[in-house]
UniProtKB/Swiss-Prot annotation:
This is UBX domain-containing protein 2. The gene is ubx2. InterPro entries: Thioredoxin-like_sf, UAS, UBA-like_sf, Ubiquitin-like_domsf, UBX_7/2, UBX_dom, UBX_domain-protein. SUPFAM superfamilies: Thioredoxin-like, UBA-like, Ubiquitin-like. Gene3D superfamilies: DNA helicase RuvA subunit, C-terminal domain, Glutaredoxin, Phosphatidylinositol 3-kinase Catalytic Subunit, Chain A, domain 1.
Length: 427
């Protein structure tokens, strides 16, 4: 035994209080490393037969080292595929700000509804990983709901109330306002069932400027400050000249009923000052005679006595004569129309098919589908077949106070009576 080995044995014995023989055994197993040999000695409980003790120790006394399982991979959607992307922009374009989200002006910032409807939805590339399948199923369901209840952005005007009044006045169109609550399912049903109907859209495009407002955003709150609203959804028609609310509804409509309601309004009101139809604001009524001063009564009497009575009588006579002649021609023309000209079966609904309502004097209504290419005479033929007495007595059909007998050879589309309500009157 050399000096180094003797020193190791002595140190081992001093620390472990064991014999030199045990020290040599443990040092031999530890390849002369004193620290390892001492550790082996205490872990084996000071067993003399270190060879067998060291070999058996791992399975008997030494605990098996536990290796922590790797962290499971997780995936999260950093950008919602239904994020509000403004139409007409691209991901690489300059209209996108920080993080890939589009820069939107004040009019485009619209809160999503309860189904995350957005003006446009730009699909993002999906990864070809196993985890993407579950996400795609959830995303597709959300996408279907968003599409189903999506607001009618194709007919909504992104204007403020003041801007809408200016625009509608220049175009001689009414302002149709729909006030909604973003979390109300009844409001979402309007988007799904009413505003997506093509017949409703057609009437709106022809006669109205359409605004859809949310009651918790500034344009909607401004509307409520000017016009009291009991509940939502709220639908109103505004006169663009004065801003007056001339018609309002707070109930649900079927598309057919709403088209009828709009046509009833258009039948009775006009923005054309030269028209003979009613102004919704009401004509200024003349002051009653008893409320006039003596001077006003005198001026009225003088004006009446000097009012060209003879010329007025002659003009009225000429007008009556012309009307009688016109009615005679119309009656003969309508009388020649055979009710058999109208097909027994209605055409199936489609893009080239419209619904026309006939309102009778007693309040009854007849509704039928016609092709847009059908002549107006076919509507007369239908009326002669369904209206009692129409095949024997002269009658007229009018739309917006204008008789349609002069348009008998025109198509329904050319006459502009698609999705309208016509007034029936016996002559």
């Amino acid at each position: 035994m050399d000096g180094d080995e003797a020193s190791l044995v002595a140190n081992f014995c001093a620390i472990t209080n064991s014999t030199p023989e045990k020290a040599q055994e443990y040092l031999s197993v530890a390849d002369g490393d004193l620290s390892t040999a001492i550790t082996l000695f205490f872990e084996s409980g000071g067993v003399t037969d270190v060879q067998s003790s060291y070999i058996e120790a791992p399975s008997q006394t030494e605990p098996v080292e536990e290796i922590r399982a790797p962290i499971a991979p997780t995936r999260e959607v950093l950008v919602d595929p239904l994020a509000d992307m403004s139409a007409g922009t691209s991901i690489m374009g300059n209209n996108f700000g920080f993080g890939g989200f589009p820069r939107m002006n004040r009019r485009q910032r619209r809160r999503m509804g309860i189904f995350d409807q957005s003006p446009s939805q730009i699909p993002f590339p999906s990864s070809n990983t196993e985890d993407s399948s579950e996400e795609s199923d959830s995303s597709s369901r959300a996408s279907r709901l968003a599409k189903l209840f999506r607001p009618p952005y194709d007919i909504i005007s992104n204007l403020s109330l003041d801007e809408a009044r200016i625009e509608a006045s220049s175009q001689k169109r009414w302002i149709l306002v729909n006030l909604q609550t973003s979390t109300s399912f009844e409001c979402q049903v309007l988007n799904r069932d009413l505003w997506k109907d093509e017949s409703v859209k057609e009437v709106i495009r022809a006669h109205f400027l359409f605004l859809q407002l949310l009651d918790d955003e500034e344009p909607g709150m401004e509307f409520k400050r000017f016009y009291p609203v009991r509940s939502t959804p709220h639908i109103a028609i505004l006169d663009p000249r004065t801003g007056e609310r001339v018609k309002e509804w707070s109930k649900s409509f079927t598309p057919a009923d709403f088209v009828i309601a709009l046509n009833d309004f258009l039948e009775g009101c006009t923005l054309d000052e030269t028209s003979g139809r009613k102004n919704p604001l009401g004509a200024k009524s003349q002051k009653p005679v008893e409320a006039m001063s003596e001077d006003e009564q005198m001026h009225k009497a003088i004006a009446a006595s000097l009012g060209n009575g003879n010329s007025t009588t002659e003009s009225q006579g000429e007008s009556s004569s012309q009307q009688a002649e016109s009615h005679g021609v119309a009656d003969d023309t309508v009388h020649k129309i055979d009710s058999a000209e109208c097909d027994a079966e209605e055409p199936s609904p489609g893009p080239n098919v419209t619904r026309i309502q006939i309102r009778m004097p007693n309040g009854a209504r007849f509704i039928r589908r016609f092709s847009l290419t059908d002549p107006v005479s076919k509507v007369y033929a239908y009326v002669k077949g369904v209206a009692e007495g129409a095949d024997k007595q002269p009658f007229s059909l009018t739309f917006q106070r204008k008789s349609l007998w002069t348009s008998l050879d025109s198509t329904i589309k050319e006459a502009g009576i698609q999705n309208t309500a016509l007034q029936f009157e016996f002559q």
